[in-house]
């Protein structure tokens, strides 16, 4: 019998619910809910030629333009097939069997997935009851031989931010540990450590075009780090990491970056609107600096998600995580989409306000922008 590597055989499959999403209001995967800039669509149509499709991609000119956009040197940028691929490239370059990855929990599961594919082992530190990172606990764990640390900032699914002060403390406490700061939601938070990549040789920043820029289908991202680490990453990388159409879309998207900025501004305004409404309804939520809000709806959360789906609205049910039972994550979209979500939730008060459910809430203390709800 043909057998896979032991590290692969041990894996729990990561299979997000991707099927059957067409034609629905997609508030489940933190995508741009209105689509990319129209100039991108026009450019992609023009690029669809037999000659273009039969030719392998060229990267140097695109790398220079993207580097200029991000404010780095071309040699400090590594093109990737989205953030998932960026994590895989990092693991291929740095992870030996048995190496330890430290991640906060809960967080984006892809870090663990690719680390375990590479044969690595896990260390976790759990967010506190306010969904803040316990930095003292992190520093204790860093005294072990941690190979790398994965930090989504803002974190997914909580939307919370790790302060620059705390990031600096961790970077300086473990100079031989690789720190990957995933800034997939940078456009919604404005928080970045990208200017630090030359100061801290152990820092890697990842960015994506899948969120604010609305190019999730094209799979385009990049790794931003010092030139030495970037060169090491390219050594183990597929020589054709990004397809030509993704490059066309990405380059036109940065040329018309105002579209993404305006969309992000609308999302941030709608995020505030939704949070105020949740407070008015006394529904617990986690204050977010991303394009989503994690909300505690109680034991009937899966039923609420199913009812929303039946009405054409997709949201992410986090009930599979023991620490997030009763939580739904809502992607924030346009003003019209946000109003519709609130209207539909208002019609489900029979599930949200179930008194038996409220008793179960006493097991949880979930922070909101104005205080505690129990």
Could you tell me what each predicted segment is?
Residues 2-82, 89:
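N-terminal small-domain helix-loop-helix segment of the aminotransferase-like
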Residues 8, 93-151:
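PLP-dependent aminotransferase-like
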Residues 73-77, 97-100, 183, 201-202, ...:
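Short acidic capping loops at alpha-helix termini that bridge into adjacent secondary structure
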Residues 129-187:
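Active-site phosphate-binding strand-loop segment of PLP-dependent enzymes
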Residues 202-286:
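PLP-dependent aminotransferase class I/II
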Residues 268, 279-311, 367, 372-373:
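Conserved PLP-binding catalytic core of the aspartate aminotransferase-like
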Residues 307-311, 316, 320-374:
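PLP-dependent enzyme catalytic core of the Aspartate aminotransferase-like
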């Amino acid at each position: 019998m043909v057998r896979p590597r032991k590290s692969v055989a041990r894996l729990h499959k990561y299979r997000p619910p991707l099927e059957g999403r067409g034609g629905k209001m997609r508030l489940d995967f933190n995508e741009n809910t209105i689509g990319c800039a129209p100039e991108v669509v026009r450019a992609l149509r023009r690029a669809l030629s037999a000659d273009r499709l039969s030719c392998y991609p060229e990267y140097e000119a695109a790398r220079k333009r993207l580097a200029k956009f991000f404010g780095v040197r071309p040699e400090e940028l590594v093109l990737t097939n989205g953030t998932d691929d960026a994590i895989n490239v990092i693991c291929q370059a740095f992870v030996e069997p048995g190496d330890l990855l430290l991640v906060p929990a809960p967080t984006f599961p892809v870090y663990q997935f690719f680390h375990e594919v590479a044969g690595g082992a896990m260390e976790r530190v759990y967010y506190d009851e306010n969904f803040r990172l316990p930095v003292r606990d992190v520093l204790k764990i860093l005294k072990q031989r941690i190979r790398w640390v994965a930090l989504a900032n803002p974190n997914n699914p909580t939307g919370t931010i790790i302060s620059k002060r705390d990031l600096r403390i961790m970077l300086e406490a473990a100079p031989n540990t690789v720190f990957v700061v995933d800034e997939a939601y940078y456009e919604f938070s404005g928080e970045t450590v990208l200017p630090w990549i030359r100061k801290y040789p152990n820092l890697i920043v990842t960015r994506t075009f899948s969120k604010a820029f609305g190019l999730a289908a094209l799979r385009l991202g990049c790794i931003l780090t010092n030139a030495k680490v970037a060169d090491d990453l390219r050594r183990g990388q597929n020589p054709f990491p990004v397809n030509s159409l993704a490059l066309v879309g990405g380059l036109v998207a940065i040329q018309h970056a105002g579209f993404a900025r305006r969309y992000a501004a609308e999302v941030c305004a709608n995020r505030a609107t939704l949070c105020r409404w949740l407070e008015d309804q006394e529904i617990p939520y986690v204050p977010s600096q991303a394009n989503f809000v994690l909300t505690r709806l109680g034991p009937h959360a899966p039923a609420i998600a199913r009812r929303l789906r039946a009405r054409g609205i997709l949201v992410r049910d986090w009930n599979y995580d023991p620490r997030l039972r009763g939580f739904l994550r809502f992607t924030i979209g346009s003003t019209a989409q946000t109003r519709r979500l609130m209207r539909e939730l208002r019609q489900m008060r029979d599930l949200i306000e179930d008194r038996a459910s409220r008793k179960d809430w006493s097991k949880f203390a979930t922070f909101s922008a104005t205080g505690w709800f129990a």
